[in-house]
């Protein structure tokens, strides 16, 4: 069982790193202007677009901050939030977990 858990963690880390390897050659972080996209806008937490509903955003509805929702950090699940787990609905067995659901349910 321990080996399965290690394999699962390794796979999740590998999947997280995939976008790094698929970064286009001619594109650099300096050439990307994030402000017109509204990526760091204060109202981004209240955005109700399908992308934010699904992936969380940057803090309001999940994301990597506090908030809630389904991202990598808010109440709803992820690393460091109140919910725990890697999923939508909260905790179960997450690193900081304690909710009713776990692991993507």
Swiss-Prot record:
Residues 23-54 form a propeptide. One of its GO terms (biological process) is neuropeptide signaling pathway. The modification Glycine amide is found at residues 59, 68, 73, 80, 91, 98. The keyword Signal applies. It is found in: Secreted. Its main location: secreted. Belongs to the YARP (YGGW-amide related peptide) family. May have antimicrobial activity. This is Neuropeptide-like protein 32. It comes from Caenorhabditis elegans. The lineage of its organism: Eukaryota, Metazoa, Ecdysozoa, Nematoda, Chromadorea. The gene is nlp-32.
């Amino acid at each position: 069982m321990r080996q399965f858990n290690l394999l699962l963690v390794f796979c999740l880390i590998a999947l997280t790193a995939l976008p790094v390897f698929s970064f286009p050659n001619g594109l650099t972080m300096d050439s990307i202007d994030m402000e017109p996209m509204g990526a760091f806008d204060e109202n981004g937490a209240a955005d109700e677009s399908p992308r934010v509903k699904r992936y969380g955003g940057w803090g309001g509805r999940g994301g990597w901050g506090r908030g809630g929702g389904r991202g990598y950090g808010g109440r709803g699940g992820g690393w460091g939030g109140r919910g725990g787990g890697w999923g939508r609905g909260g905790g179960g067995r997450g690193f900081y977990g304690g909710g009713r659901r776990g692991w993507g349910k």
